[in-house]
From Swiss-Prot:
Parts of the chain that traverse the membrane: 483-504
Family designation: Belongs to the type I cytokine receptor family. Type 1 subfamily.
Cross-link type Glycyl lysine isopeptide (Lys-Gly) (interchain with G-Cter in ubiquitin), residue numbers: K544, K564
Source organism (scientific name): Mus musculus
GO MF annotation list: thrombopoietin receptor activity
Gene3D superfamilies to which the protein is assigned, alphabetical: Immunoglobulins (2.60.40.10)
Keywords assigned by UniProt, alphabetized: Cell membrane, Glycoprotein, Golgi apparatus, Isopeptide bond, Membrane, Phosphoprotein, Receptor, Repeat, Signal, Transmembrane, Transmembrane helix, Ubl conjugation
Taxonomic lineage: Eukaryota, Metazoa, Chordata, Craniata, Vertebrata
Annotated gene: Mpl
UniProt key word RNA-binding: no
Protein name, per record: Thrombopoietin receptor
Induction (free text): Expression in the bone marrow displays diurnal rhythmicity (a circadian rhythm that is synchronized with the day/night cycle).
Membrane topology category: Single-pass type I membrane protein
Amino acid sequence: MPSWALFMVTSCLLLALPNQAQVTSQDVFLLALGTEPLNCFSQTFEDLTCFWDEEEAAPSGTYQLLYAYRGEKPRACPLYSQSVPTFGTRYVCQFPAQDEVRLFFPLHLWVKNVSLNQTLIQRVLFVDSVGLPAPPRVIKARGGSQPGELQIHWEAPAPEISDFLRHELRYGPTDSSNATAPSVIQLLSTETCCPTLWMPNPVPVLDQPPCVHPTASQPHGPAPFLTVKGGSCLVSGLQAGKSYWLQLRSQPDGVSLRGSWGPWSFPVTVDLPGDAVTIGLQCFTLDLKMVTCQWQQQDRTSSQGFFRHSRTRCCPTDRDPTWEKCEEEEPRPGSQPALVSRCHFKSRNDSVIHILVEVTTAQGAVHSYLGSPFWIHQAVLLPTPSLHWREVSSGRLELEWQHQSSWAAQETCYQLRYTGEGREDWKVLEPSLGARGGTLELRPRARYSLQLRARLNGPTYQGPWSAWSPPARVSTGSETAWITLVTALLLVLSLSALLGLLLLKWQFPAHYRRLRHALWPSLPDLHRVLGQYLRDTAALSPSKATVTDSCEEVEPSLLEILPKSSESTPLPLCPSQPQMDYRGLQPCLRTMPLSVCPPMAETGSCCTTHIANHSYLPLSYWQQP
């Protein structure tokens, strides 16, 4: 039999037998049988169902279930039987609706065999401790305000006890490739769950007050709600752009009411929108009025942007959000298709802005991308700052930048990046918040490119980074610091030495003269040095004995030439001392009695020191004409 046919038959049976509660095998499993022969549970804590199993079927009217509160007369609960293949026959009793089910009072139960007039089972229980809540119904799931968030809404089957229940979520990806992956079970805490209020006159979403929890009636009028209809929870940490299935179940909180976990609800599937970061979504404002959003345009696709405003509240609304179309910027006629799509809209500063982008492929498939919500003062885009620099020393730059938005100067932070010529890696520096300049140390005799950008990051305004400024080309000079230092040091030392010498000359002349003689000695007498040199050379001449022997080798002449008359003109005297012009004269010749010069020709003669005048010459030289 098909599943839909089985569902229709079961529904007809339930409609035909409205007073007969069905005890399913799942209910039996959840009650953890084996501790009590008579099992009872309550789904809304306003009803009660009890059952027990017998191995053999008995005729109708054989068994009877009696119940009574303390001090009251026992009453019989109508029984009906179910065939259980494993245990035989199951007898089930659902308390009549007209009989009030009381909480926090002991309830006495008896199972009797009427034919034998024998009590088979006896039990005392509290209805508030045998809870088995039915699963939530009318479950709605959709993406939250953040990428990867799941917002769940449901209606409680028993509104009166919804505040005393806790819920558990079971979910997993619907992708068939991950079918074997274990499902995730998460206990939904009260911090992420809020009750959904049912109000007689719903107000617009933006005018709804913050989440109101159920309270007693106010003395000045009725409460702004009637009953708690259901709940709402926000689950985060999911993967954006994926499809998930989910189930919910409930359990008493264990404080006011106690019991077991109820059955799981039917699975509900939901498709989460993708993260708009993957398409490069960026929204900004220049005047705090108009908001511009841009994203990357893919090939052979069309896209459209949507926006909505919402108020922050602790409980999300169960209504589907209303998205407004963002006004798209049309490309210029004749221009090539833009790689970036843009749209703009007028915003307010008193609500949160949500952005949704729908991309339609060439095959007609629609993919949704959700951006992170933001306030308009968190998306202020600054113009590109201008960078000025000057080199104060070799490799040391003094930087200054100016910005047009002086009203937000103290909340503006900057990023400076630079790189060497021919390199692709950038070094990024972040000056302190609100800085208007700084210094940068670079390598001398090199070329660099510098760029600057800015953004707001203060307590009042925030925003994205601006575009990088045009590259500033910098050529650093040679490193002359050490030359300047050495020159200055030499000048200081020279001046100090000069001042010291002047002071020494004035105060201590004797010491000054000695110091001057030691530092600047007087030039020697060249004549004295030459004479000393000649004397030293003569001392190193051959010994006297050797010269005497050589003189003895010269034999004297036996002829003496005398003049004719003794009245001849006297010759000038020769100097008694030999001249130093002929240092090569033999020492033996210095003692010879050569006192007059020989007669000269008629033209006259003079005394000469030529060595030929002191030697014996051939006779023909002295003959008269």
